[in-house]
Structure formats: structure tokens, C-alpha cells
Amino acid sequence: MAPKGKVGTKGKKQIHEENQDTLKFYSRIILGANAIYIAVNLLLFYNSSSFWTWFSLMFAVAVYVGSYRSMSAMAKPAFAEDGSLLDGGIDLNMEQGMAEHLKDVILLTAIVQVLSTLSSYFWYLWLLAPARALHLLWVNFLGPWFSADSQAAPEENEKNDKKQRRQERRQMRRF
């Protein structure tokens, strides 16, 4: 049974500690994926590495740097002059937040990067990121904007509502 009442809020100290743990976890994922990719593609199979091997590594590093820096900027705490914590930063573990999407991008890139040691075709899976971004853009912004009624529509809706009410009254009289 679900607990009744409001969900408890986190304190700024707890948010700060969880943010530090989250950043540490994702930095380990980034370092691990890069280590595996470099060990396999650039050390073990150095003779068969090409421009695309280096390009994909640079692409992954750029994605990692952008995502990780954004997350660390969001989680940056504010301290008072005496060293006490004023603000723990934005909660990186908050559901439906921007940090959730950044974490997904890091995980997708790490998975694709490690799988690409088996075949370069796994890089096509990275197309899931822009597809997800377009889906979110459509669902949250473009779809509602295109399906919104125009300014002239409320007048027509009032006329149609009046006609509908008249027809309902007539039907009620008949029965």
C-alpha cells in the first residue's frame, strides 16, 4: 500500500551528497567505456583502426564532456563564507528533469561505444538519442501547438454548442 500524504522532500545536504555520488558514478562509467574502447580498438586492433575509429572516439568524448559538464553545472553547490552549505544544487536524481535526459545520453553513448568494439554498425544505435529528442519535442511543444484551436474557433465553438444544446432539447421533447 502506498504511503499517504506528501512525499518527503530532500534536504540540501542530502541533495549535495547524492549529486556527488551520481557524478562519481557517471564519471566511472565514462572512464570505463573509454578504457574498453581504447584498449580494444586502438591498442589491440591498432592496425585496423581508421579515421572513423578516431572520429567515433572524439564524438563520444564530446558527448561525454558536454553531458557531464552540464550535469556538474546543475549540481554545483553554493557555500557561505563560513563554509556552510547554502544550496545543494539541482537534484540530479529528480524524475523528469533535464539531468535524467543527460544521464540517458551518457548511458546510451557508453553502451554504443562498448558494443562498437564488436561492430561499427552499433554506432547507428546512437540515432536513438535524436529520435527521442524529436519525440519529446513533438509531444511537449509542437504537437500541442499544431493541434491548438485558432483564435476564430471559440466563436464557432459557441455557435456549435448552442446548436448542439437546441438539438438535445428537441430530442428530449420528442421522448
Curated annotation (Swiss-Prot):
InterPro entries: SND2/TMEM208. Pfam families: TMEM208_SND2 (PF05620). It is found in: Endoplasmic reticulum membrane. The keyword Membrane applies. It comes from the Eukaryota. It is a multi-pass membrane protein. The chain crosses the membrane at residues 25-45, 51-68, 105-126. Residues 162-175 have a biased composition (Basic residues). The keyword Disulfide bond does not apply. One of its GO terms (cellular component) is vacuole. Residues 152-175 are annotated as: Disordered. Keywords: Autophagy, Endoplasmic reticulum, Membrane, Transmembrane, Transmembrane helix. GO terms for biological process: autophagy; vacuolar protein processing. Belongs to the TMEM208 family. May function as a negative regulator of endoplasmic reticulum-stress induced autophagy. This is Transmembrane protein 208. It comes from Danio rerio. The gene is tmem208.
